[in-house]
Amino acid sequence: MTEPLIRFENLYKVYGSDPRSVMPLVREGHSKDEILAETGHTLGLRDINLEIEKGQIFVIMGLSGSGQSTLVRHLNRLIDPTEGAIYVGGIDVMNLSQTELEDFRCHRMSMVFQRFGLLPHRTVLENVAFGLSIQKIAKAEREEKAREWLRSVGLDGYEDQYPSQLSGGQQQRVGLARALCTDPEILLMDEPFSSLDRLIRSGMQDLLVELQDKLHKTIVFITHDLDEALRLGHQIAILKDGVLSQVGRPEEILRNSADDYVEAFVRDVNRARGLSTITNP
């Protein structure tokens, strides 16, 4: 059996002044609200065990505050867990030195943000090439690669524009090109299309599917939109208050909801239409 590329084991995250002191209550099953009321600490994640296969688009869903962004930010250690282990390609991410962690972030993964995260004082070309400049790639080489990625996302000819001159959809294309320009193994996408109008959003989904068919990256994708999750995901994980409610293929989520919380997500979906939108077999 193939080893998963990403593995979370018994992952817990508690926010507050003394998170470890709260762990006995967490293990006893106290709710998020109870822990906050009793200790002033906030439960972010509770006992997450999750595997993500290489080459998948893995979608993470949940209501706001359910822990999706917290979970994803553990992968590159923008957030460290209170307890638990994180493995990427067999490497224990928690054991990386600061130098190793910086190299890991530079070369193994990239992020695409909801609010684009572009540098306003740099041109489109400079924004796309930014990650390569951090890697100290020669200017001519990084600009050549940046131009290639701009062509790939349909922005050939926009190299000398500035982010403020672009539409929201165009800015997110720049963000996607920038993330891919460093050739990362893993792409972390935190609600990347949620601020776009529906038509532009659909076009960005099409572009992502088209690029993924060619590149076969491992993509961890956060969304609140079930239609988007069904269209993009090989697997979907649904979180509630930092706990995994269900993990499964899109059709499993639609047909066999694990609990009332998951059922609430799929209740208003036309199931026949939802099944027909599933892109990934």
For each feature predicted by the language model, list its residue ranges.
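ABC ATPase "signature
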Residues: 247-248, 256
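Conserved ABC ATPase signature
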Residues: 162-166, 170
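Conserved ABC ATPase "signature" region
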Residues: 7, 24-34, 91-92, 129, ...
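Conserved ABC transporter NBD signature motif
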Residues: 84-92
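Helix-to-loop junction immediately C-terminal to a conserved catalytic motif
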Residues: 76
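Conserved ABC ATPase "signature" C-loop
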Residues: 241-242
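A short, proline-enriched helix->beta-strand linker immediately N-terminal to the Walker B motif
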Residues: 181-185
